[in-house]
Amino acid sequence: MRSDVPFLDPDSLTTPFAHLSDPRTDGETVRIALLSDTHVAVDGEATPRKAFHRTGELLERAVEDANGRDVDRLVLAGDLTKDGHPDEFALFEERVEGADAPLLAVPGNHDVPKENDDHETPPLSRFARRYAPGLPFRHRVGPVDLIGLNSAETPDGVLSGVHHGQVSTDQLDWLDRTLGRAETPLVVVHHNPLSLPQVADRAADWPWHVYRHADPTSFLRLLDDHDVPLLITGHQHVPSLRHENGLTQVIAPALASYPLSYLLVEIGVRGTDLTLVPVGMTGDLTESYENAAAGEAHHRAMLSYTDETLRSLPF
């Protein structure tokens, strides 16, 4: 067992991820459990990238842990399911049934219909009804404006056969109007508009550019125009943080991948504290780490970046 990896230590319950000066509130602290890439599978096997065989159990543990932290909301940054099968959505709902806090989610590319599906994936409209107050959405949590966007599907269907994402023009218009009224915005979307060159440089066999936001310029300009301090994304399965032009982009850890964790986001008078909360047992973490280490070059590149990130926390 790799005892030098912090999350293989059963006594390591949480790890500070980052402290940001903004967003902040005038008094009330808002506490959010931010999960991403849960990839719930009904009949799944372990792969170098995802612990499909443990996803339901990991999600249930995360919900129980979040309940114990008295969070105000449970927020998911996309890819709730393995491949959007109705049975996977049913299992997801079963595993989050015990959540004390209200749940909100944005869709990931694995949650929407795709051209190569061998099953009938529920339409985006159902996702918006069941897991959000519509899409896009603005949801007030105390003094915080939680803003959720859909980057997994566009009206023209251009994303139906790919894994990258895009925020549609209609959503950008809505976002421009909405941010003009938001006092303390926290924006959540599945696909990350800022790239991860640290990972791409390590894996020549992995086309990272096709897995990000396809046309990020207008989106990033809009966030900059409204001085949005924090954007939380998922999708890449590598916990990271990047600053650019006043914006901090956080890629949340994937619950289905090493280090089998979620983020606790606490927004208060002194700014925002992000804490990494692992929910995998020691054996789960060891297995997840070793599966990634035995994978292809891009799996090992993701693992090495994640490993270095964990060792150097907080950002």
Predicted segments with their positions:
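Beta-strand-turn-beta hairpins that frame and shape the catalytic cleft
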Residues: S21-L34, R138-G148, G180-L186, H243-Q249, ...
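N-terminal active-site segment of His-dependent metallophosphoesterases
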Residues: M1-F89
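A short C-terminal boundary segment appended to hydrolase-like catalytic domains
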Residues: M1-A18, G27-E28, V269-F315
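Conserved beta-sheet core of the metallophosphoesterase superfamily
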Residues: E97, A200-G280
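Active-site environment of divalent metal-dependent phosphoester hydrolases
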Residues: A41-V42, T81-D87, P107-D117, E153-L159, ...
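Active-site neighborhood of phospho(di)ester-bond hydrolases with catalytic His/Asp-centered motifs
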Residues: L34-S36, R73-D79, L103-N109, V187-H190, ...
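Extended active-site neighborhood of metal-dependent phosphoesterases/phosphodiesterases
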Residues: V5-R24, P86-R181, L222-D224, L264
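Acidic/histidine-rich helix-loop elements
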Residues: A33-E57, V112-R130, P155-V167, A203-W208, ...
